[in-house]
């Protein structure tokens, strides 16, 4: 499970690097082609393994409006992330994307009756300090638009993640991925022809861009497969902290593609976000580790 989570983190980071290389294409174009490829892959998978045959768990009827809302929030998160990847350093864009746990804790405090312990609240405050650090507008490449996109990215990813718990009662995983892919392919296909600078716009891809689109689709699909496999093989709390490797990979691949090294303020912010995320995940990590250890010791 840990190896698959590591592979998922690396694969998604490579996908983000591919997005940066395709900065000549609009974010809407990338969303359209990325999700058309995913829908085709899931469709081929369903030809061999139909969901009604492989899913033995009883499901509730309906849930389509919830699936649509989850798809739209996840799509907005991806749109904001793609925009930042194209316009700022890959490491900073990756750090914004990994602020999701901070907003989950905040929404849990504000909108649910779940009890949040003081250490988690303190970890969340550390994360917000990290966000403030990477929102340093004194850096030449980071503008107000990037800060807004980064905040939207984290908030929308948190909302999309929190909706998964309810959606599992209605759909299996492949159906949720297909619903998300179809929704975002339609949204991307429509809005790339509507003038919304700098997000929209369409130009026929050249040979290099078609190759990039193909690699983007393959990496995205592989990343989703590795991530799913990781959560099947190991408890979520045990492997979730490894997802923060995406920030490290983002900095490495960004520098390889020409980004400058993060300044001290940005590096401090990235470090605080990683520390915050690991601290937020720590109680679940320890709980799952004990269960996993006890299970492995049983004869």
Show the residue positions of the predicted features.
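Loop-to-transmembrane-helix transition segments
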Residues: 1-7, 53-80, 145-153, 202-222
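Hydrophobic/small/kink-forming positions within alpha-helical transmembrane segments
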Residues: 9-13, 43, 71-79, 101-106, ...
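Transmembrane alpha-helical segments that form core, pore/gating elements
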Residues: 17-20, 42, 140-205, 290-299
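Membrane-interface helix termini and inter-helical loops of multi-pass transporters
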Residues: 17-27, 54-56, 132-143, 194-212, ...
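Transmembrane alpha-helices of multi-pass small-molecule transport proteins
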Residues: 26-76, 156-160, 179-196, 275
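Helix-helix packing/entry segments at the starts of transmembrane helices
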Residues: 94-99, 167-183, 224-255
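C-terminal transmembrane-helix exit sites in multi-pass transporters
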Residues: 101-122, 248-267
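Hydrophobic transmembrane alpha-helices of multi-pass small-molecule transport proteins
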Residues: 119-136, 265-284
